[in-house]
Amino acid sequence: MTAVRDRVGDKMKLMTDPASSLPSFMAAVEVGRACDDLGFFWYEDPYRDASSSASAHKRLRDFIKTPMLIAEHIRGFEQKADFVLMGGTDILHIDPELDGGITGTMKLAHFCDAVGMEVQLHTAGPMHRHCMSAIPNTHFYELGLVNPDRVWNGLQPPIYTDDYGDSVGDVGADGCVPVPTGPGLGVTYDWDKINAWETAAVVFE
């Protein structure tokens, strides 16, 4: 963390995501205080409870100053609303693929806006772009698992026949990505590629 801050200086916002891997509460405090010292923008899902305990994260917030981004692993409107009302986070993680689709995601975003809280959309995709374009209380579009040597998002493989993509090269010079404008989600899926990669199928009737 210190090496990254030294490399980029103050020209970039930095965040860290231990992915619920820190072994104890005190380890989470230690990393959180390092975030404080280095001016991190947020501190995400630190320790091994998988961000499931609102009371534990409320207590952790008392020990550090860096805003916490929690609730990637909690599903649904009611559970996430409880987490917010119990003081378990500073920023709420939401995801249209996991939180009741676009409708559930927008409900959570509006709820948080009403109580003065910001949200962060988890990962990327056409739904995420549409939601983000309609949410005022959010900051960043997440292209996860990319780096200069891995240019496409490992969570969002290239499965489109149009110019949509979630790779490093799809980010504009201004740091933004466009919102698809076609019918539905605005993208055209490459079903030949999707079917070629299929490993199993289940039909619900």
Feature annotation, model-predicted:
Residues 158-205:
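C-terminal extensions of enzymes
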Residues 18, 47, 95-98, 183:
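Short loop or secondary-structure boundary microenvironments that flank
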Residues 5-8, 132-136, 198-201:
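Structural signal for hydrophobic packing residues in well-ordered secondary-structure cores
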Residues 33, 39, 50-69, 74-176:
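Shared catalytic-loop signature of beta/alpha-barrel
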Residues 1-58:
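Metal-dependent enolase-superfamily TIM-barrel catalytic cores that perform enediolate-based chemistry
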Residues 25, 54, 102, 184-191:
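Electropositive phosphate-/nucleotide-binding environments in soluble metabolic enzymes
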